[in-house]
């Protein structure tokens, strides 16, 4: 080492470990309109001050590492570092805090959810100084939002493609989810669509297994769809699951779906990955396909209250990455979903501008500028008695998806679809006449069942089915 180098080292660099809070805790920082803002629920290890914990999150998810390094002097850390700018104790919780972190926009590649998540929810979640860490919300600034295509088409374009307005759309997941041959699968699709449903759906588990290869399924489902359309005069769709082991295979399946002329395909966006999902979303926009998104694996990430990532963040990420539908819980069915919180992220999916509202778990005002909206899908353990509540909770721009609630009808698949369609039309008519669905829902269904034997049979089968468990995802 030359004497000149030694002199520079002694002046410009001091080795050792520094407290994160000296650099990354900046309570006087005024956030910029271009910053990505994050709200983390932080549970520090005993003895770790909240300021140090919040600063550690900001550091490890941006420019920091565990020790001072030579190359810090070769860039401007003040320009690129994340900053913990506010800390709030969580009411009713001991040693737990909401730490707000601001990230400069230049830290992230344009149009890449993958890159954004690699930083913000990357290695920092394994940091030893923290007992637990959960990302509660993100504010995506318009400057970053505009670098994404977003959903292939959006709510209004889908309505226009289907020529269906003024009511929720109806769907059904084909059951049993695994084991049917392609021809029997197509038969179930036809019966459900003929009975009055708008969509049927591949289960997320269905890709291309030995009992039913994807090409056979696509062919029989397309035949079923066209036959049902010819008989009902309505445009129908089946969510053909294009999820595959490689992006190339996924696109091959999407191309075949387009060649068949079907209106919609499907992707499991978490198990498939954001890079694959964005790739498929771009293909769907370019080729006129709607894109249905399933959220398989989300509960691994979002169900624990103290660690992981809230679904509202995954919902925002999906709106950026691209999808025209996404499953969003039901509030009333068998799957997790507390009402105010669910409606909070439903608004984040559909609306152009959403104000901060902590009572619904929304930590930041979100402006989506020109990104189209996503239709929420209510699915999981729902049946005809739930129809008034679902119509009231989710409104018209939604898909109400009944799997067992269609195929479990005692008279068969088509009568099950008829029962759901009659129940929906009755609820929409009652709402439009000014009736209170929340208070009069059961009576509305009983009245409709008097002139629909299919609905009456469904009401009798599911009159005592309830899923009354407390939601784990509370504020």
Curated annotation (Swiss-Prot):
Cofactor(s) needed for function: Mg(2+)
Site (Transition state stabilizer): residue numbering on this chain: 334
Modification after translation, per record: The disulfide bond which can form in the large chain dimeric partners within the hexadecamer appears to be associated with oxidative stress and protein turnover.
Active-site residues (renumbered): 175 (proton acceptor), 294 (proton acceptor)
Primary localisation category: plastid
Modified residues annotated as N6,N6,N6-trimethyllysine in this record: 14
InterPro entries per record: RuBisCO, RuBisCo_large_chain_AS, RuBisCO_lsu_C, RuBisCO_lsu_C_sf, RuBisCO_lsu_fd_N, RuBisCO_lsu_N_sf, RuBisCO_lsuI
Note: The basic functional RuBisCO is composed of a large chain homodimer in a 'head-to-tail' conformation. In form I RuBisCO this homodimer is arranged in a barrel-like tetramer with the small subunits forming a tetrameric 'cap' on each end of the 'barrel'.
Protein name, entry field: Ribulose bisphosphate carboxylase large chain
The organism of origin for this protein: Citrus sinensis
């Amino acid at each position: 080492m030359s004497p000149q180098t030694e002199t520079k080292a002694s002046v410009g660099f001091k080795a050792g470990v520094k407290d994160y809070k000296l650099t990354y805790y900046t309570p006087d920082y005024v956030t910029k309109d271009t910053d990505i803002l994050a709200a983390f629920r932080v549970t520090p290890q005993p003895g770790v001050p909240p300021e140090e914990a919040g600063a550690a999150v900001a550091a490890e998810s941006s420019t920091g590492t565990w020790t001072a390094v030579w190359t810090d002097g070769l860039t401007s850390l003040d320009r690129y570092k994340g900053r913990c700018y506010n800390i709030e104790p969580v009411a009713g919780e001991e040693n737990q805090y909401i730490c707000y972190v601001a990230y400069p926009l230049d830290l992230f590649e344009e149009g890449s959810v993958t890159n954004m998540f690699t930083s913000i929810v990357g290695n920092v979640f394994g940091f030893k100084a923290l007992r637990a860490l959960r990302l509660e919300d993100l504010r995506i600034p318009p400057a970053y939002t505009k670098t994404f295509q977003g959903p292939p088409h959006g709510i209004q374009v889908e309505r226009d493609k289907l020529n269906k307005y003024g009511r929720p759309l109806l769907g059904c997941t084909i059951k049993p989810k695994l084991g049917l041959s392609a021809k029997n699968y197509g038969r179930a699709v036809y019966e459900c669509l003929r009975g009055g449903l708008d969509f049927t759906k591949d289960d997320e588990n269905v890709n291309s297994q030995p009992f039913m290869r994807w090409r056979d399924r696509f062919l029989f489902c397309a035949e079923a769809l066209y036959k049902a359309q010819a008989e009902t005069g309505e445009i129908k769709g089946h969510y053909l699951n294009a999820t595959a082991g490689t992006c190339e295979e996924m696109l091959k399946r999407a191309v075949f779906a387009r060649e068949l002329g079907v209106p919609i395909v499907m992707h499991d966006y978490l198990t498939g990955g954001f890079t694959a999902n964005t790739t498929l979303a771009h293909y769907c926009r370019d080729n006129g396909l709607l894109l249905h998104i399933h959220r398989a694996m989300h509960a691994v990430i979002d169900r624990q209250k103290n660690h992981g990532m809230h679904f509202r963040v995954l919902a925002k990420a999906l709106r950026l990455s691209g999808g025209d539908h996404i499953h969003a819980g039901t509030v009333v069915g068998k799957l997790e979903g507390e009402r105010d919180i669910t409606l909070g992220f439903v608004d984040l999916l559909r609306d152009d501008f959403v104000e901060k509202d902590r009572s619904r778990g929304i930590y930041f005002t979100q402006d989506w500028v020109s990104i189209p909206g996503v239709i929420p899908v209510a699915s999981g353990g729902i049946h005809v008695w739930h129809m008034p509540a679902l119509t009231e909770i989710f409104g018209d721009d939604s898909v109400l998806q009944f799997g067992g609630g269609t195929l479990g009808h005692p008279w068969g698949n088509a009568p099950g679809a008829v029962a759901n369609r009659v129940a929906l039309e009755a609820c929409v008519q009652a709402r439009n006449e000014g009736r209170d669905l929340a208070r009069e829902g059961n009576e509305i269904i009983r009245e409709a069942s008097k002139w629909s034997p299919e609905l009456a049979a469904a009401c009798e089968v599911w009159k005592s089915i309830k899923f009354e468990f407390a939601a784990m995802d509370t504020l």
